[in-house]
Structure formats: structure tokens, C-alpha cells
């Protein structure tokens, strides 16, 4: 879509910064990500000046419900300090949710259908929970938990823990990518084979899966953070 209509402008921009653009420099999933970010920024720009504790609008009510839900989940998974990490949880949840839902719009495709996008989110979550784990416990205590509770078991536990932690980004990536890709393909197949009301059912299912996968990704990230910041280390 972008390359069909705005490739010339894209080439000009990449030329200004000294890059040598290819014939089609903008992949669809890149432009979809940028569009998702732009939509989120515009929504918050609209919401910010309209915030009111006395007369909240529908958009404010919606985001207050989302905030309350995220806060409750963070407190449940991490404890009383869970609210300290809400900024990251909220960012990852809202981005993945909007990235999933944009695929419902005709002519658009969800960027989470491309493995590199879920992988980017998973890598961000991986680095985040390790960083906050070090901040909460100190580098020495955080690394010590990889050895397990007994020094004699350290040669066995360290490889197991390392493999377990390295598998987490892969698990997050495959789960999000596979579910979104499969849902999109099922919707497209039925859209081509049947009347409109039948694909509408699958589009509703696609919306449900979009919310569910964003929630699961966020919930697993919360669990990883909870394990990383636990003071039993």
C-alpha cells in the first residue's frame, strides 16, 4: 500500500539521510507498525486535554477501565510494587492490541502476522524483566538465582535456567505470530468462499483473539517480571 502510493516520498526521505533506498524500501509490516503508533499517539493527544475527574468522556472511561484492569493484574502477579511497572505493561499491551486489531480493517494487515514484530516485542520484554530484576536485587543476587538453592546443583541448574530464559522470547514470538497469522488466513479464506455474514463471524473471532493474545503476552511478561524482582533471589 505504502509503496504503491508514497514510495517516491519514502525514497526522497531516505535519500536526505544518506541511505540508498531499494525499489520497494518500506515493508508492509513496517508501515503498519508506524500507522499503529500514529493512531495511538493521536488517540492520547485527543484524550489528554479532555481529561476531567468530574465529567469524564467515553474515551476517558475506556482507558480508565484498561488502566484499572492492568493495575489489578500487576498487583495480582507482582504484589504491591506492581504499579511501578505499569508503564511498560500498558505500552506493550496497547501496542500489540492495536497491531492485532488493525488487521480487521479491509486493506490493512496486522503487523503481528510477521514474525519479526512479535520477536521485537518479545526481545523488549526479555531485556526489560532482566533489567528490572537486576535493579531490584542487585547484579550478584540476581545472577545467583540461576545457580539454584543448593551450590551442589549449580552445574545442573545454570544450563537449565539459561535455556529456560532464552526460550521465553521464542515462546512469546511463536505464540503471538502463529495465532494472528492463522486467524488472518482463516478469515481471508472464508471471505473468498462465502457471503459476508459468515466471514463477519470469523472477524468477530479475530477481534476476540486479538484481545486474548495481547492479554496473554502482557500476562506472561508480568509473570517474568514477578519472578525477576522477587526478593527470594
UniProtKB/Swiss-Prot annotation:
Gene behind this protein: atpB
Family: Belongs to the ATPase A chain family.
Lineage: Bacteria, Pseudomonadati, Acidobacteriota, Terriglobia, Bryobacterales
Annotated Gene Ontology cellular component terms: plasma membrane; proton-transporting ATP synthase complex
Membrane topology: Multi-pass membrane protein
CDD domains listed in its UniProt record: ATP-synt_Fo_a_6 (cd00310)
Name of this protein: ATP synthase subunit a
Subunit composition and interactions: F-type ATPases have 2 components, CF(1) - the catalytic core - and CF(0) - the membrane proton channel. CF(1) has five subunits: alpha(3), beta(3), gamma(1), delta(1), epsilon(1). CF(0) has three main subunits: a(1), b(2) and c(9-12). The alpha and beta chains form an alternating ring which encloses part of the gamma chain. CF(1) is attached to CF(0) by a central stalk formed by the gamma and epsilon chains, while a peripheral stalk is formed by the delta and b chains.
Matches recorded under SUPFAM superfamilies: F1F0 ATP synthase subunit A
Task performed by this protein: Key component of the proton channel; it plays a direct role in the translocation of protons across the membrane.
Superkingdom: Bacteria
InterPro entries on file: ATP_syn_F0_a_bact/chloroplast, ATP_synth_F0_asu, ATP_synth_F0_asu_AS, F0_ATP_A_sf
Alphabetized HAMAP family for the sequence: ATP_synth_a_bact
Compartment(s) of residence: Cell inner membrane
Amino acid at each position: 500500500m505504502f509503496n504503491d502510493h508514497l514510495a517516491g516520498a519514502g525514497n526522497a526521505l531516505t535519500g536526505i539521510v544518506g541511505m540508498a533506498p531499494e525499489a520497494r524500501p518500506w515493508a508492509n509490516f513496517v508501515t503498519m507498525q508506524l500507522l499503529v503508533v500514529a493512531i495511538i499517539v493521536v488517540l492520547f493527544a485527543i484524550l489528554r486535554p479532555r481529561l476531567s475527574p468530574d465529567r469524564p468522556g467515553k474515551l476517558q472511561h475506556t482507558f480508565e477501565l484498561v488502566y484499572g484492569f492492568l493495575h489489578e493484574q500487576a498487583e495480582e502477579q507482582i504484589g504491591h510494587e506492581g504499579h511501578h511497572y505499569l508503564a511498560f505493561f500498558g505500552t506493550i499491551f496497547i501496542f500489540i492490541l492495536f497491531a492485532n486489531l488493525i488487521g480487521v480493517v479491509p486493506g490493512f494487515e496486522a503487523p503481528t502476522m510477521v514474525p519479526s514484530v512479535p520477536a521485537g516485542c518479545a526481545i523488549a520484554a526479555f531485556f526489560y524483566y532482566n533489567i528490572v530484576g537486576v535493579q531490584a536485587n542487585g547484579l550478584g543476587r540476581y545472577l545467583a538465582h540461576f545457580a539454584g538453592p543448593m551450590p551442589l546443583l549449580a552445574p545442573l541448574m545454570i544450563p537449565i535456567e539459561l535455556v529456560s530464559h532464552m526460550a521465553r522470547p521464542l515462546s512469546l514470538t511463536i505464540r503471538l505470530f502463529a495465532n494472528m497469522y492463522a486467524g488472518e488466513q482463516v478469515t481471508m479464506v472464508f471471505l473468498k468462499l462465502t457471503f459476508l455474514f459468515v466471514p463477519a463471524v470469523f472477524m468477530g473471532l479475530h477481534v476476540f483473539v486479538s484481545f486474548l493474545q495481547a492479554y496473554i503476552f502482557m500476562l506472561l511478561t508480568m509473570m517474568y517480571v514477578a519472578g525477576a524482582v522477587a526478593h527470594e533471589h
